[in-house]
Amino acid sequence: PATMTLPVEELESILKTAAEYKKECENINQIETKNDKKRADFVGINMEGPFISPIKKGAQDERNIIPCNEEIAQRFLDASDHLVKFLGIAPEESANAVSFIKNMKDKVNISLAHTNASYETAKEALEAGANHIVHLFNAMTGFTHREPGVVGAASDNEHTMSEIICDGVHIHPSMIRAAFKMMSAERMIFISDSMRATGMPDGQYTLGGLDVKVTGNR
């Protein structure tokens, strides 16, 4: 699962609960058989905030966005008992982004997420040790012939993995095909990026404290 951009204390509480649930699942695994299992394995957490860009916040609450902070990031890792596997940042929003990446990269995978970074800034972040792109094309700089942005930097860095949403709504199928040609299937990760209203009737729902209206498949 992925966390939203929420107050730091609330995120810590969520991460502690997730760690407790993980331990409970491990205890259950010891007594149930493979045929009894009716749930997915909880393998880790993807944090899409709060170190993101207010310009590319998408459905995140701007009030809770903060610059990269190693102390706070360590609190997240500790609260989750290191269940956090991906930590998203917008490198252009923090003067210390490169040092943050270098100091944290051996503890957690650093993603570029909800970012308005230029090609040069994204390239620098990836060379510093970031290795993952959150939902390619969505909530990031555009990909054009003069300003290739985050997509161009990800394409150029062969050590970078990129998520992509293949629901036919977030990205045009032509761009999905183009991404696979640029980066190869081995570097692409299919994600749903779905919320709890997925599969529910049209209506009003909430996402990270924000009101969301569902109409059809949007």
Predicted features and spans:
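Ser/Thr-centric signal marking residues that sit
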Residues: 1-5, 115, 192
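Conserved strand-turn element in the central/C-terminal portion of the radical SAM core barrel
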Residues: 2-8, 89, 162-167
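Histidine/acidic-residue-rich, glycine-tolerant segments that coordinate divalent metal ions
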Residues: 6-148, 199
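Active-site-adjacent C-terminal substructures of enzyme catalytic domains
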Residues: 121-218
